[in-house]
């Protein structure tokens, strides 16, 4: 562990973006401003602000936010004393026009996110962000679903489009430290030395901190976390804990250990609609390696067909389903109900 003594990392805050998921994208401008100012004062260098599903995420499918991306970004950016602001963009949801808008409002970092086997859809957005001279990140989601060799190919594609940092993203909170090490080591070795490596964790198996430290050991210099863990599932890596652990290990974050605790406790916990914890549902997501948005579909299917949502989620994980295949959840539930003799004869 002493090998990390004196190493510096950039802690990237997710409270105001991934944290939009448990808030159903309904954070107020005042909540955004207050939390962002607290994070800024605590020394957090980079803060992500958008709809939970990124720029342009406002839709029937993903949820309508309380305010537009422009309003959220416009409220936060002028107040920042030292922190820079980032925005997430998923090709197919966010467009080049959203990217331009973000740049004009003063967004410093753009993170272009794709499924971990689909980096090729990011070329237009990554190359355009680089043209705008933005800090440009390629963000490979659900990374447990690709092999280290497969992730290397995808990471190199994003790097070739112009990304100056590549993220390995554990969207389901499925990975264990050894999974993180084998993937990040391979990607770190394959990228140019000047290309940064990042890690985004979820706490569904309580591995957020351990995985983040494993990532730092493999050369990651950017680590995502959220105050009080506010994020999808059991939340993101809790920032106040990560900062304290890094401090104990001699890893420099530039974030004040006490101030970030106060932001989490005094500003973030009071706005939670429900406790962010490892409940049965979040644990199943992590155990089965399933994307968080499948949960409600699985619960609906349970009511309709009598197959427990937990069993269905495990099966979806086994089949390697990814975001966008929500229609297959119904099909899988129907098949399982048939196999278990839960359907009336005429339906079978």
Swiss-Prot record:
The keyword Metal-binding applies. Substrate binds at residues 17-18, 171, 200, 291. One of its GO terms (molecular function) is manganese ion binding. The lineage of its organism: Bacteria, Pseudomonadati, Pseudomonadota, Betaproteobacteria, Burkholderiales. The record marks 17 as: Transition state stabilizer. Keywords: Aromatic hydrocarbons catabolism, Lyase, Manganese, Metal-binding. GO terms for biological process: catabolic process; L-leucine biosynthetic process. Belongs to the 4-hydroxy-2-oxovalerate aldolase family. It comes from Ralstonia pickettii (strain 12J). This is 4-hydroxy-2-oxovalerate aldolase. Mn(2+) binds at residues 18, 200, 202. It holds the Pfam family HMGL-like.
């Amino acid at each position: 562990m002493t090998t990390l003594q004196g190493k510096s990392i950039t802690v990237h805050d997710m409270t105001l973006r991934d944290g939009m998921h448990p808030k159903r994208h309904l954070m107020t401008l005042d909540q955004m401003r207050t939390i962002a100012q607290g994070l800024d004062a605590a020394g957090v260098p980079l803060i992500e602000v958008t709809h939970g599903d990124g720029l342009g995420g406002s839709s029937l499918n993903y949820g309508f936010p309380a305010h537009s991306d422009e309003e959220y970004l416009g409220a936060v950016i002028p107040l920042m004393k030292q922190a820079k602001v980032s925005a997430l963009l998923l090709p197919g949801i966010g467009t080049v026009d959203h990217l331009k808008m973000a740049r004009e409002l003063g967004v410093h970092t753009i993170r272009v996110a794709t499924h971990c086997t689909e980096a090729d859809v990011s070329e237009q957005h990554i190359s355009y962000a680089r043209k705008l001279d933005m800090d440009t990140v390629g963000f490979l989601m659900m990374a447990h679903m690709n092999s280290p060799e497969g992730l290397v190919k995808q990471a190199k594609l994003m790097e070739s489009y112009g990304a100056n940092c590549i993220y390995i993203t554990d969207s389901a909170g499925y990975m264990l430290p050894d999974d993180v090490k084998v993937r990040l080591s391979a990607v770190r070795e394959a990228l140019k030395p000047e290309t940064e490596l990042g890690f985004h964790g979820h706490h569904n198996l309580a591995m957020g901190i351990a995985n983040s430290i494993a990532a730092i050991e493999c050369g990651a210099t950017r680590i995502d976390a959220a105050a009080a863990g506010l994020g999808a599932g059991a939340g993101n890596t809790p920032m106040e804990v990560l900062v304290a652990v890094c401090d104990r290990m001699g890893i420099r974050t530039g974030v004040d250990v006490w101030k970030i605790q106060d932001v989490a406790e005094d500003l973030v916990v009071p706005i939670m609609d429900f406790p962010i914890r490892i409940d049965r549902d979040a644990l199943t997501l992590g155990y089965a390696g399933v994307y968080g948005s499948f949960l409600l579909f699985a619960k609906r299917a349970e009511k309709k067909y009598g197959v427990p949502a937990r069993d269905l989620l495990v099966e979806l994980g086994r089949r390697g389903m990814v975001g966008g295949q929500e229609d297959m959840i119904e099909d899988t539930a129907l098949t399982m109900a048939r196999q278990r003799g839960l359907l009336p004869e005429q339906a079978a």
